[in-house]
């Protein structure tokens, strides 16, 4: 895992097309902005895990 330190307003690049910017810090919460092409899915981890779990559940087709 790469660990980086960024200040509010600073950005990091992921590849050529994705940027992650620190928008603010309040207590133990960090607000970040992600700028990515439409074809790149961006989800919070808990949402991504839910999507993956739904994909593996059998569907009822009666």
From Swiss-Prot:
| Entries under Gene3D superfamilies matching the protein | Translational regulator CsrA
Alphabetical GO biological process terms: mRNA catabolic process; negative regulation of translational initiation; positive regulation of translational initiation; regulation of carbohydrate metabolic process
**InterPro entries under this entry?**
CsrA, CsrA_sf
Q: Which residue windows are coiled coil?
A: none
For molecular function, the Gene Ontology terms on record are: mRNA 5'-UTR binding
Record text on subunit structure and interactions = Homodimer; the beta-strands of each monomer intercalate to form a hydrophobic core, while the alpha-helices form wings that extend away from the core.
What exactly does this protein do? A key translational regulator that binds mRNA to regulate translation initiation and/or mRNA stability. Mediates global changes in gene expression, shifting from rapid growth to stress survival by linking envelope stress, the stringent response and the catabolite repression systems. Usually binds in the 5'-UTR; binding at or near the Shine-Dalgarno sequence prevents ribosome-binding, repressing translation, binding elsewhere in the 5'-UTR can activate translation and/or stabilize the mRNA. Its function is antagonized by small RNA(s). Expression from a low-copy number plasmid has no effect on swimming, but blocks swarming and virulence factor expression as measured by cell lengthening and hemolysin, protease, urease and flagellin production. Expression destabilizes hemolysin mRNA. Complements an E.coli disruption mutant.
Q: Which HAMAP family match?
A: CsrA
Put simply, this protein is called: Translational regulator CsrA
């Amino acid at each position: 895992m790469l660990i980086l330190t960024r200040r509010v307003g600073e950005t990091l690049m992921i590849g050529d097309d994705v940027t992650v910017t620190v928008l603010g810090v309040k207590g133990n919460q960090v607000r970040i902005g992600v700028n990515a092409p439409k074809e790149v899915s961006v989800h919070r981890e808990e949402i991504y895990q839910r999507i993956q779990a739904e994909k593996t559940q059998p569907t009822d087709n009666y």
